[in-house]
Amino acid sequence: MKHTNRKTAGRNGKRPAGRRVLYLALTLGLGGAGVAALAPDPVEASQVTIYKSPTCGCCTKWVSYLERQGFETEVVSTTDLASVHAENGVPHALGSCHTAVVEGYVLEGHVPAAEIKRLLSERPAVVGLAVPGMPAGSPGMEGLVRQSYDVLAFQKDGASVVFAHR
């Protein structure tokens, strides 16, 4: 059954062509832009699974930081991070207090959201990113003191290169 709005319908029961065009333009043009503006950035909506010690406070701060940056998180508490490192190809020298996995990449330590987004956007052929050593001023390690630090991209063989300097 066809429904028409009597207030806007012409004699033949249809909307006048001008109004139909305006309606379509507003619906597809402005409405589409509005919907696109509300949709989350696909990178920001990525699911990050974090493996961390149940007692680690800085890890919890890093998780909160990621959520504020638009990432969805799932936290898995573990007392055996060494096994998590081994299963995910994290070189011993780069090991930190938590390991995360996002879209097939591994994140080790306090990796900034901007570098995660860049990783997911550029999709380099690496295992993942690491911020070894828990540097002061990195996400989750905020405080009065701030150290400069490197975000390293690492390979399966343990080789790493500077991905970003902060």
For each feature predicted by the language model, list its residue ranges.
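Secretory/periplasmic and organellar redox-cofactor proteins
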Residues: 1-46, 137-166
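Stable alpha-helical elements in mature extracytoplasmic
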Residues: 55, 62, 77-80, 112-116
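Flexible, glycine-rich phosphate/dinucleotide-binding loops
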Residues: 57, 82, 138
